Amino acid sequence: MVAPSQFKQLEKVGNGTYATVYKGLNKTTGVYVALKEVKLDSEEGTPSTAIREISLMKELKHDNIVRLFDVIHTENKLTLVFEFMDNDLKKFMDNRNKGNSHKGLEMDLVKYFQWQLLQGVAFCHENRILHRDLKPQNLLINNRGQLKLGDFGLARAFGIPVNTFSSEVVTLWYRAPDVLMGSRNYCTSIDIWSCGCILAEMIMGKPLFPGSNDEEQLKLIFDTMGTPVEQTWPQVTQLAKYNPLLPPHMPRDLKQLLQNNTEEVLDDNVVDLLHGLLQLNPDARLSAKDALNHPWFAEYNHAN
């Protein structure tokens, strides 16, 4: 543990789901850091599981994961010291959209960001860690164009909150249909669904499934991807929140949907990858490793 006095707190840079984030300066090294302050319940203190999970994060060292340098534990707060990143994917896309109604990113950039996202996710899954809350706000970007997963492990350490003490609304837009229908079998496939939603959003410049509650979220998903049935998703009807009165929908043409929202001509490979990430049945979704070996990433795989 380092002394809090080693860091100088600079301007506030945001409210996260769990914490307030400040830009900070390591007075010893002169390096900028992000100081994430988690207020602790004075009666309950810090859950030991949270400390354990956060300690695990310190061991996650990968180019596409934001480094957690240290944890400072004082009586009423926990300060997590992260590497400082200049931007996040949501702000990056919003800035590109200024003056435009909706405009996706250039496909070369989409591919570069998606490759980095999947690299980070694959590394975490290999280490048996789920993110559970992947969304553009949690994908941090530095001025060299490196994309890194942020808030890794925090969703597990503190639970995904239903309501938060910050102005940020916990979004359902990237949440997998199995989770929305009450599945308790959280596994790596929930992060893969989120990766698919993020890929579509980078292409279109707007969220693929912008629902405002669980029910509407599922409706939007099934309207586009088709209504699940036992043949394509065994035991879907056993899920706690499965609705037997769901109107049957056939899957829509995903390529057409994306193409209508982008000026670039999409190749079939990116659409095929998206189908692999957005399988309704979690067991049918690609793994992060398989996704990285997809033909859409051929140029990256040949370069390595």
UniProtKB/Swiss-Prot annotation:
Assigned EC number: 2.7.11.22
Record-linked InterPro entries: CDK, Kinase-like_dom_sf, Prot_kinase_dom, Protein_kinase_ATP_BS, Ser/Thr_kinase_AS
Active site location: D133 (proton acceptor)
Binding sites annotated in the UniProt record for ATP: V13, G14, N15, G16, T17, Y18, A19, T20, V21, K36
EC category: transferase
Pfam families: Pkinase (PF00069)
Gene Ontology molecular function: any one: ATP binding
GO annotations of cellular component type: cytoplasm; nucleus; serine/threonine protein kinase complex
Keywords: ATP-binding, Kinase, Nucleotide-binding, Serine/threonine-protein kinase, Transferase
Domain Protein kinase stretches: 7-297
Catalysed transformations (reactions): L-seryl-[protein] + ATP = O-phospho-L-seryl-[protein] + ADP + H(+); L-threonyl-[protein] + ATP = O-phospho-L-threonyl-[protein] + ADP + H(+)
BP terms from Gene Ontology: positive regulation of biosynthetic process; regulation of DNA-templated transcription
Domain of life: Eukaryota
Subunit structure: Interacts with a number of cyclins.
Sequence similarity: Belongs to the protein kinase superfamily. CMGC Ser/Thr protein kinase family. CDC2/CDKX subfamily.
Function: When phosphate concentrations are high it phosphorylates the PHO4 transcription factor thus establishing repression.
UniProt name for this protein: Negative regulator of the PHO system
Organism listed in the record: Kluyveromyces lactis (strain ATCC 8585 / CBS 2359 / DSM 70799 / NBRC 1267 / NRRL Y-1140 / WM37)
